[in-house]
């Protein structure tokens, strides 16, 4: 084992990275070596045991905890690990398999003092808290000590407070840094391996950034040169962390700019991030990791500057001269406690433990922790989002600025974040989900899986289902197109993908750490954002699509001065706020998702859309059949699916919807008259905020066209198919087609559209996200593309690609003529589709499709109604 391990260490060192943590097999071999250590290897073996095993409920942690527990009890021995040392080391494992041995040790006079100290600093107790409480009530003095320590928050007060002054060297990335820059999609396979994945951070050359190997390895030498100044680095940018929800982006930044976490291999916390604007999901993942994110004017900060940051005073000064460079206010003073606790999640869990202990001991509420500021009283009404979150918190509504922990009814995870979420769940010692429904998809890696992806496909489903979650299968399709069909109206949820934007209810997408917390505990921390209201009125004009309305939102915000495309001094009224949409109440739920989905591109924290009951009743009636069909097809966890079906049936029995109050307050209101939108609206390369009229970009030569992503539904493919069916000869473009789900693909095949796509020479992808994310399939380098996908960030769909975002209808026309049409040309083409619009824009109602109803009708529930 040692020979193999040292070989691995050497291989990783050649790559410039630390070795992987030990796995269960290596840990089992290490146990045998610890029992009879080879001469001269003692120190090395102990270091492996202490520092190279993941904590929580990792498989290797199970072996480690079992060995240490056996040593503590005297069931086995090691010349290197005494029973006392074994208890001490169990105390470094955070939670999970180490807890019962520590609680048992409270009854051993020799080991109890060490066990008490260890438990006093262990937060992941969950229901094991009551075992300690029971011992304390029975008179165990050491259990009493533990209870008192928790009540006194010694776990928190023993950690160093946030410093008055933090001296750092500036690592500045000008313009906008999105999470794809920090965690590139083609490298998604390596995300759980943080040191390896971090090497790809900023691997594409840009102003001020010098990758070691452009397109492969990021600016490691540049970072190392700055570190030689003797101070930690701070990540600084004009706009930081937009785009996908990748916790891996935070992990990569902190690998270079954070602090080691004692006894936790290959993971770092802490760190400092300064941004003119910091995207909300990235801000949250920084908080969760114990970093200090600060929104501040960074125009006076330059690469390599040494600065002093005063978090309490809200000042940034030049380290040498003391010159004031910028001032700021922390988003909340609770950030100070979050940094001290090692992150927002440890703080929340720890505060809860302290509260529980104080209640058990009959003590008043602790005054140790900073509280979120009280929100000013208001006699005004609540918005729809405020009411939804309020209901999830058991109150009428939640005011902007208030801290709350809403109940998570639905949680989604996908396969490029799922392996990290799995690791986070292990760290949280989670063996069962508390959220009502947790769903795992395999949409980002199904098309062209690497061996590591195949391993994920084989191992992650059982991990999720064993904890009560629902697992999809590779090839099933896009996470959102499935999760939306499992939703309950007016409920709150989250997902490990920035496009988790419920069309009924509301979701606050998050990084994998927060998603794991939400799944494990059934709640999520939230500083309630303000809302921006977008009101549509009037009638849609001929040829105009919902995608044009999606792009009308940034266009009209630009017109009102609420949004700028320029990154320096960026204005974005939507950033960190909730986008609330009214004026389109009769949309089908599938259509409504097109609007809520795109709130991700606005950097909004979440989105609601006001719909009438009828489309929601139709949608849930269809979805009940789909979920029953899933049970018939052997999907699990069956109990979770049955419970969700019962929840849908209960709502349908009395279909009531929340509504915004007429006097609700909004940070801004944007009115859009549909009569004024007379031509398609696109987003120009390479910025989803850069909305343009078709007439402004007409004639642009197009090389490739992509019709697919979570922004599409079956109607879009019928529309494209009808346009393509009229075309004779070869297309002048390369056309990609990827339906969102296997159900869409099956129906399109049955209706003959796959034949049309095939004859047109289209490259038909399996349902999923491959090209949209750009992690597997890619367009040609430097291609000009029209895409129905979500984002057009630089290098996302292809290296150096210029991507226009547009409707499926406009994309199909561009595929046919090899350029962006004039508005008149476009109208000529779409008139062909409009003639059969009723047939084209039909949606998947599973209750009307015999291949689903026949199987659904045979399902007999195994749980009581």
From Swiss-Prot:
It holds the Pfam family Aconitase. Disruption phenotype: Cells lacking this gene do not grow on propionate unless glutamate is added, and the addition of glutamate does not restore growth to the level of wild-type. Also unable to grow on acetate and citrate and only slight improvements are observed when glutamate is added. AcnB mutant also shows an impaired binding to the surface of macrophage-like cells, is less motile and possesses fewer flagella due to a level of the flagellum protein FliC lower. Substrate binds at residues 191, 244-246, 414-416, 498, 791, 796. This is Aconitate hydratase B. It is an enzyme of class 4 (lyase). Coiled coil: none annotated. The lineage of its organism: Bacteria, Pseudomonadati, Pseudomonadota, Gammaproteobacteria, Enterobacterales. Monomer. Pathway: Carbohydrate metabolism; tricarboxylic acid cycle; isocitrate from oxaloacetate: step 2/2; Organic acid metabolism; propanoate degradation. GO terms for biological process: propionate catabolic process, 2-methylcitrate cycle; tricarboxylic acid cycle. Its EC number is 4.2.1.3, 4.2.1.99. Binds 1 [4Fe-4S] cluster per subunit. Its cofactor is [4Fe-4S] cluster. CDD domains: AcnB, AcnB_Swivel. The keyword Iron applies. GO terms for cellular component: cytosol. [4Fe-4S] cluster binds at residues 710, 769, 772. GO terms for molecular function: 2-methylisocitrate dehydratase activity; 4 iron, 4 sulfur cluster binding; aconitate hydratase activity; metal ion binding; mRNA 3'-UTR binding; mRNA binding. InterPro entries: Acnase/IPM_dHydase_lsu_aba_1/3, Acoase/IPM_deHydtase_lsu_aba, Aconitase/3IPM_dehydase_swvl, Aconitase/IPM_isomerase, Aconitase_4Fe-4S_BS, Aconitase_4Fe-4S_dom, Aconitase_B, Aconitase_B_HEAT-like_dom. Gene3D superfamilies: Aconitase, Domain 2, Aconitase, domain 3, Aconitase, domain 4, Aconitate B, HEAT-like domain. It comes from the Bacteria. Involved in the catabolism of short chain fatty acids (SCFA) via the tricarboxylic acid (TCA)(acetyl degradation route) and the 2-methylcitrate cycle I (propionate degradation route). Catalyzes the reversible isomerization of citrate to isocitrate via cis-aconitate. Also catalyzes the hydration of 2-methyl-cis-aconitate to yield (2R,3S)-2-methylisocitrate. The apo form of AcnB functions as a RNA-binding regulatory protein which regulates FliC synthesis via interaction with the ftsH transcript to decrease the intracellular levels of FtsH. Keywords: 4Fe-4S, Iron, Iron-sulfur, Lyase, Metal-binding, RNA-binding, Tricarboxylic acid cycle. It catalyses: citrate = D-threo-isocitrate; (2S,3R)-3-hydroxybutane-1,2,3-tricarboxylate = 2-methyl-cis-aconitate + H2O.
């Amino acid at each position: 084992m040692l020979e193999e391990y040292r070989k691995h260490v050497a291989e990783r060192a050649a790559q410039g990275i630390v070795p992987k943590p030990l796995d269960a097999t290596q840990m089992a071999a290490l146990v045998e070596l610890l029992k009879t250590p080879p001469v001269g290897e003692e120190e090395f073996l102990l270091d492996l045991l202490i520092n190279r095993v993941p904590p929580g409920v990792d498989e290797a942690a199970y072996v480690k905890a079992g060995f240490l527990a056996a040593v503590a009890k005297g069931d086995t021995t090691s010349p290197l690990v005494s029973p006392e040392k074994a208890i001490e080391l169990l105390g470094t494992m955070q939670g999970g398999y180490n807890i019962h041995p520590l609680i048992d040790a409270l009854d051993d006079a020799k080991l109890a003092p060490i066990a008490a100290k260890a438990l006093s600093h262990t937060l992941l107790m969950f229901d094991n808290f009551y075992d300690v409480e029971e011992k304390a009530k029975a008179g165990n003095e050491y259990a009493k000590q533990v209870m008192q320590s928790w009540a006194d928050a010694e776990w928190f007060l023993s950690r160093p407070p946030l410093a008055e002054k933090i001296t750092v060297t500036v690592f500045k990335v000008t313009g906008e840094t999105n999470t794809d820059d920090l965690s590139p999609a083609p490298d998604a396979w390596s995300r759980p391996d943080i040191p390896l994945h971090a090497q790809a951070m900023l691997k594409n050359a840009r102003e001020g950034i010098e990758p070691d190997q452009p397109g492969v390895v990021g600016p490691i030498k540049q970072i190392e040169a700055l570190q030689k100044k003797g101070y930690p680095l701070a990540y600084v940018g004009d706009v930081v962390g937009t785009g996908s929800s990748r916790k891996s982006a935070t992990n990569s930044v902190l690998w270079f700019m954070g602090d080691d976490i004692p006894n936790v291999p290959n993971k770092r916390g802490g760190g400092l991030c300064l941004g003119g604007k910091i995207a909300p999901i990235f801000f949250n993942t920084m908080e969760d990791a114990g970093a200090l994110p600060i929104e501040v004017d960074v125009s006076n900060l330059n690469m390599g500057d040494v600065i002093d940051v005063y978090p309490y005073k809200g000042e940034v000064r030049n380290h040498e001269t003391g010159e004031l460079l910028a001032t700021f206010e922390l988003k909340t003073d609770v950030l100070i406690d979050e940094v001290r606790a090692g992150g927002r999640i440890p703080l929340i869990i720890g505060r809860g433990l302290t509260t529980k202990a104080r209640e058990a001991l009959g003590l008043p509420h602790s005054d140790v922790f900073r509280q979120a500021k009280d929100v000013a009283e208001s006699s005004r009404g609540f918005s729809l989002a405020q009411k939804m979150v309020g209901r999830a918190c058991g109150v009428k509504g939640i005011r902007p600025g208030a801290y709350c922990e809403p109940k998570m009814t639905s949680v989604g995870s996908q396969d490029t974040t799922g392996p990290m979420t799995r690791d986070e769940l292990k760290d949280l010692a989670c063996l069962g989900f508390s959220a009502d429904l947790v769903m795992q998809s395999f949409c980002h890696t199904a098309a062209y899986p690497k061996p590591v992806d195949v391993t994920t496909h084989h191992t992650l489903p059982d991990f999720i289902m064993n904890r009560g979650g629902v697992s999809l299968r590779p090839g099933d399709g896009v996470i959102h197109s499935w999760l939306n069909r499992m939703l309950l109206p007016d409920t709150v949820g989250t997902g490990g993908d920035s496009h988790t934007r419920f069309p009924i209810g509301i979701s606050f997408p998050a990084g994998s750490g927060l998603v794991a917390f939400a799944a494990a505990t059934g709640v999520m921390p939230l500083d309630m954002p303000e809302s921006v209201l977008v009101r549509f009125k009037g009638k849609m004009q001929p040829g105009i699509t919902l995608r044009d309305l999606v792009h009308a939102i940034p266009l009209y915000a630009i017109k009102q001065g609420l949004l700028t495309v320029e990154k320096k001094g960026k204005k974005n009224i939507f950033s960190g706020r909730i986008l609330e949409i009214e004026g389109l109440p009769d949309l089908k739920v599938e259509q409504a998702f097109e609007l809520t989905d795109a709130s991700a591109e606005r950097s909004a924290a979440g989105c609601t859309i006001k719909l009438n009951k009828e489309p929601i009743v139709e949608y849930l009636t269809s979805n009940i059949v789909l979920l029953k069909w899933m049970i018939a097809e052997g999907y699990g966890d069956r109990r979770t699916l049955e419970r969700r079906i019962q929840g849908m049936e209960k709502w349908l029995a009395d279909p009531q919807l929340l509504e915004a109050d007429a006097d609700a307050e909004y940070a801004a209101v944007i009115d859009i008259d549909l009569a004024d939108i007379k031509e398609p609206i696109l987003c120009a390369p390479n910025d989803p905020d850069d909305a343009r009229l078709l007439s402004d970009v007409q004639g642009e030569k197009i090389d490739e066209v992509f019709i697919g992503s979570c922004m599409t539904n079956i109607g879009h493919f019928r529309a494209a198919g009808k346009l393509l069916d009229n075309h004779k000869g070869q297309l002048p473009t390369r056309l990609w087609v990827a339906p969102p789900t296997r159900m869409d693909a099956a129906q399109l095949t049955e209706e003959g559209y796959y034949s049309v796509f095939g004859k047109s020479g289209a490259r038909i992808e399996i349902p999923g996200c491959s090209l949209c994310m750009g992690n597997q399939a890619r367009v040609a380098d430097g291609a000009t593309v029209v895409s129905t996908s979500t984002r057009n960030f630089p290098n996302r769909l292809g290296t150096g690609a210029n991507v226009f975002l547009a409707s499926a209808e406009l994309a199909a026309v561009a595929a046919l003529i090899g350029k962006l049409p004039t508005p008149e040309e476009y109208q000529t083409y779409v008139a062909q589709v409009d003639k059969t619009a009723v047939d084209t824009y039909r949606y998947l109602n599973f209750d009307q499709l015999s291949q689903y109803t026949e199987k659904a009708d045979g399902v007999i529930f195994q749980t009581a109604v």
